[in-house]
Amino acid sequence: MDHLNLMPDTNSFSDHIEFLRDEIDKALSKIPINGSPKYLYDPIQYVISGKGKRFRPILAHLSGQAHNADPYALMKVSLAIELLHNFSLVHDDMMDGDEIRHGKPSVHNKWDDSTAILAGDGLFSLAQLLLTDLPQIIFQRFNEVALTICEGQGLDKEFEHDTSISINQYLSMISKKTGALLGLSAELGSRLGNLDDHTNLNMYEFGLNLGLAFQIQDDYLEIFSASAMMGKSLRSDIILGKKTFLMLSLIHI
């Protein structure tokens, strides 16, 4: 990497967020991606070039900067987190039949299911490669949370059309599917700053709870927002019988 300065000349928090988002986008565009086979790498490039919010890598940067983490290691972790997030979105969109992601056709919609499976696998592999020279605990926690996300998706599918699901079960599911990655984002920034285990756990819990709030809000917007504003397909939760906070509140009235 060239000289990496992730602290802009501004006292505005919102300007700092935009600066980090731009730096993350630039770094994503520089990830080495082969041109062949196009069947694999064209959809991967398509996903990486998408205009996501970069919420998770930004959180990792903020956590790391607060704890004086090395900026090079922090950028690698942030990119790996964003690739893991996009891997999960590519597969989730296919499983749920969602046709729009980040304002453009989802991978399985633009190509097909087989392409989406392979592209997701490739994104996950690229994420792993970014972590190879970082401390072993970073690699371990990354993969522990990756498995937790898969568990959350498994619970999400199991809960479809099951009217016995409680709000506590729902909260457990979204803590795995959504909260865990935000928890990891906050935690890994702390770990790169060589903080103690108690602080690392607190950072994970902070991110986890942020993720729960984010998912509950997303459940609301899934029903009451507009697809153009959200940049993704909406209403599929109702069609598929997904268990959301609003749906469960209605069931348990």
Question: Where are the predicted features?
Answer:
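Mg2+-dependent prenyl diphosphate-binding active-site environment of isoprenoid biosynthetic enzymes
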Residues: 19, 29, 33-251
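N-terminal amphipathic/basic leader segments beginning at the initiator methionine
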Residues: 2-29
